[in-house]
Amino acid sequence: MTEINYNLPVWDLTEIYTDIKDPKIKTDLKKIKDSSNKFVKKWKGKIKDLNSLDFLKCIETYQKICENLHKIGTHSSLIFATNMEDAEISRYNSSVSDEFTEIFSSLIFFTLELSKVDDVKIQSWMNNNNSSKWKPYLNVLRKRNPYLLD
């Protein structure tokens, strides 16, 4: 028979947050919510009319919001994966998941509007050298367009 090794390695997530009670988590979530709210107010309903510079500002802001949110999400899911029976960790993971869902729900307009931008406009955005790195993302998004809900 194979012997089970219960001394498995443990992730060191202190580079992200010290623990699930780290006050920086709440601070970061507030910053992300504030950034998301500003993003929605500034860009919702306007994506198809952006010039190439505004497109670049918009998509880079969206990227930063997503990166920051995924940092918290990664922390909570990895801690939860290592100890699913701990009630406090479970509550933390559930709370982060709820925040994650709320924020991304407010941002869904971005990918929906972006997927409907016509080819001429996208090409004008891509003519800006700094925007061309987004072409693969836009291509994938546009291929999914028929399957997206309004």
Describe the residue ranges of each PLM region.
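A well-structured
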Residues: M1-D150
